[in-house]
Amino acid sequence: MLRRKPTRLELKLDDIEEFENIRKDLETRKKQKEDVEVVGGSDGEGAIGLSSDPKSREQMINDRIGYKPQPKPNNRSSQFGSLEF
């Protein structure tokens, strides 16, 4: 394997400005998210979510990930299709 000398990277003024803009955007988003959490936390939702029964906890998780469970049918025709016994 051939070795080569490290390539020098030049830091330009445009790069610094872009970095500062992105950092400011991230900070404002973080502050907005914290403000929403503080307002949501004062409603008491956090305390209810922690102390509630497992069914509602499971339901909260399913809602968060977008999972909508379908009830399983219990009759034989749905399990075996159109087979006749």
UniProtKB/Swiss-Prot annotation:
Q: How does it assemble?
A: V-shaped homodimer. Interacts with CDC16. The mammalian APC/C is composed at least of 14 distinct subunits ANAPC1, ANAPC2, CDC27/APC3, ANAPC4, ANAPC5, CDC16/APC6, ANAPC7, CDC23/APC8, ANAPC10, ANAPC11, CDC26/APC12, ANAPC13, ANAPC15 and ANAPC16 that assemble into a complex of at least 19 chains with a combined molecular mass of around 1.2 MDa; APC/C interacts with FZR1 and FBXO5. Interacts with FBXO43.
This chain's protein is named Anaphase-promoting complex subunit CDC26
Task: From the UniProt record, list the coiled-coil ranges.
Answer: 7-38
Modified residues annotated as Phosphoserine in this record: S42, S82
* Known function: Component of the anaphase promoting complex/cyclosome (APC/C), a cell cycle-regulated E3 ubiquitin ligase that controls progression through mitosis and the G1 phase of the cell cycle. The APC/C complex acts by mediating ubiquitination and subsequent degradation of target proteins: it mainly mediates the formation of 'Lys-11'-linked polyubiquitin chains and, to a lower extent, the formation of 'Lys-48'- and 'Lys-63'-linked polyubiquitin chains. The APC/C complex catalyzes assembly of branched 'Lys-11'-/'Lys-48'-linked branched ubiquitin chains on target proteins.
The superkingdom of the source organism is Eukaryota
Q: Which family does it belong to?
A: Belongs to the CDC26 family.
Give the organism the record lists: Homo sapiens
How is this protein annotated for GO cellular component?
Answer: anaphase-promoting complex; cytosol; nucleoplasm
